[in-house]
Amino acid sequence: MSAKKSPEEMKSIFQKYAAKEGDPNQLSKEELKLLIQSEFPSLLKASSTLDNLFKELDKNGDGEVSYEEFEVFFKKLSQ
């Protein structure tokens, strides 16, 4: 999938993966991994990349990524 997606498309992608387990408004680390593997596979060249990405995205340190936190990632990809 191209990183050039509209904000609406990215919100839909986020919601699809966030709904897999737990809070449907948050991505767990496993949900983020599934999203990245499916939508942006070139970003996961090493398993440590996911850990680093998750730490970077989880700004409030609650162990999950909200849409607002994910949106920052999407904006970086779109540049």
UniProtKB/Swiss-Prot annotation:
Phosphoprotein keyword on record: yes
Residue positions binding Ca(2+) 2: 58, 60, 62, 64, 69
Q: Which residues carry this modification: N-acetylserine?
A: 2
Ranges for domain EF-hand come to: 13-48, 45-79
Residues annotated with Phosphoserine modification: 42, 47
GO MF, one term, reads: vitamin D binding
Q: Which domain of life is it from?
A: Eukaryota
Xref: PANTHER family:
PROTEIN S100-G (PTHR11639:SF73), S100 CALCIUM-BINDING PROTEIN (PTHR11639)
Something else known: The synthesis of this protein in the absorptive cells of the rat duodenum is vitamin D3-dependent.
Can you name this protein? Protein S100-G
Origin species, per record, is Rattus norvegicus (Rat)
Provide the taxonomic classification.
Eukaryota, Metazoa, Chordata, Craniata, Vertebrata
